[in-house]
Amino acid sequence: MSDWLYRFFCDVVSPLLFTKDGKHLSPPQIFGKNGSKPATFWIQPPEPVVSLTSHQFDPTILYRPRVFLWLPHFLVKDLMCPNCKKQILEKNGACPPRRIVDIEDSFYVVTWTYYCRKGCQSHFRGWTPSLLDSLPPYLRLAFPAVLSRRSGLSHRVLTQLRVGNQHKMGPSGVRSLLFELHTHRFNVLQAQYVEAVFEVVRGRQEMVDSSQQSLHAYISSSVPPFGDFSDVDKYAGFVPSENYLTQMMNKAIEHDEHDANQHTSCLAPDQLAIDDSHKVSHLLLSD
């Protein structure tokens, strides 16, 4: 994790996770329990135009990702252990954020670790499949991603994989599409940043001698470069490999196998098997 991203989680995300009402943790303000703002699970990045209009030339503001706060213990009366199903899970600290690849960028999921202290003494993370399956369906369906061992894909990317596979565009084509969309978003942010800097340059150019030759003389030395798409210390753009997309698509299909089989069994049969028992007597006579 780059330094700017680490500071972002420390300064912005961490205070929301550890909001207290007296001695006890309370739901984050973005959950909208007080009714002052619309409730949401998402921490949205600032609008680039707002910071650029005020000439805040800090690329890390434009790099900021979306963050999904998954805190199910605030959304159910009792968070029960999915193993023993008898004891209430206790909070056991926040998990490291997990990066999820979406259609045109990546976002992060942040959750808690839970511990069944009085029961089976098992540990669970908020995105553990068994814990997700134990939640009410309406709450479980709000989780936005399917996770792998270290990363994950959003449901929107998986839907794109399914639809692409149905229309003869496999994981290779979907990866090319994701790369195009991710780099396009980066290019738009970069263009906004550069155009805002040039606006300052043009404004200063009118105030200096027309004999000035170098553009760099108009730009403050404190304006940092925007960086490259794949620079891990800056924007850190990322698109998964074709093999990873294939594995995740197969994982999603296997997860839905039971429902697919149940759906197939409910369909009206178009053709029934033909009874070939009359051939048995013919075979016996031939022997």
What are these regions (language model features)?
Residues 73-74, 107-110, 118, 264-266, ...:
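Intrinsically disordered, low-complexity regulatory regions enriched in Ser/Pro/Gly/Thr
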Residues 89-222:
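DNA- and nucleic-acid-binding/regulatory domain cores of transcription factors and nucleic-acid enzymes
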Residues 77, 112-113, 268-272:
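Core residues of folded domains in eukaryotic genome-function proteins
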Residues 59-65, 92-107, 251-256:
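Short linear interaction motifs
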Residues 1-80:
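N-terminal alpha-helical interaction blocks
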Residues 78-84, 116-119:
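Short cysteine-rich clusters marking metal-coordination/redox-active sites
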Residues 52-58, 86-91, 153, 269:
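Helix-boundary capping/turn motifs
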Residues 202-287:
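RNase H-like nuclease fold core
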